[in-house]
């Protein structure tokens, strides 16, 4: 722990097209080797495709997809007297968003479609319909937390 002042979290600039901080964070997570303009192009193309499929506007469709992937509980390892327990803990809102976005990008990268924009659009539309790899990941995390509910009293 720092003995001096606590440094605040950096303010993220909203993305130029929609003015959304959440979308700017998503672009940053998708970005590889500092190529932000490439990442922005991929995200905007994916959102355009997603909006055409769903009939909603881009931000709404993105928000719905993200909402279906956000975890509410996760497990953390806790050592108690020589044995390690998987203790279920509630996920803070900022981490919820971060995990959801990370899982969506991971799942999109593993897909076998043509372009990254198409892969991302497909993963987001799957997430909006409550299916796909990212949603499965969230369900697995929730299942782990449910299975280890007995150790919830070890929370710190």
Swiss-Prot record:
One of its GO terms (cellular component) is small ribosomal subunit. It comes from the Bacteria. GO terms for biological process: translation. PROSITE patterns: RIBOSOMAL_S7. Keywords: Ribonucleoprotein, Ribosomal protein, RNA-binding, rRNA-binding, tRNA-binding. One of its GO terms (molecular function) is rRNA binding. It holds the Pfam family Ribosomal_S7. Part of the 30S ribosomal subunit. Contacts proteins S9 and S11. One of the primary rRNA binding proteins, it binds directly to 16S rRNA where it nucleates assembly of the head domain of the 30S subunit. Is located at the subunit interface close to the decoding center, probably blocks exit of the E-site tRNA. Belongs to the universal ribosomal protein uS7 family. This is Small ribosomal subunit protein uS7. It comes from Erwinia tasmaniensis (strain DSM 17950 / CFBP 7177 / CIP 109463 / NCPPB 4357 / Et1/99).
């Amino acid at each position: 722990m720092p003995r001096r002042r606590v440094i605040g979290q950096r303010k993220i600039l909203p993305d130029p097209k929609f003015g959304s901080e959440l979308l700017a964070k998503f672009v940053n997570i998708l970005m590889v080797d500092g190529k932000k303009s490439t990442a922005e192009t991929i995200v905007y193309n994916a959102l355009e495709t997603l909006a055409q499929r769903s009939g909603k506007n881009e931000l709404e469709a993105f928000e719905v997809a993200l909402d279906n992937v956000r975890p509410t509980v996760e497990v953390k390892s806790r050592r108690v007297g020589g044995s390690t327990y998987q203790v279920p803990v509630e996920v803070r809102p900022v981490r919820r968003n971060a995990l959801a976005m990370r899982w969506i990008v991971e799942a999109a990268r593993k897909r076998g479609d043509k372009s990254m924009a198409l892969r991302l659009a497909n993963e987001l539309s799957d997430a909006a319909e409550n299916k796909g790899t990212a949603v499965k990941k969230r369900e697995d995390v929730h299942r782990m937390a449910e299975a280890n509910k007995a150790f919830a009293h070890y929370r710190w």
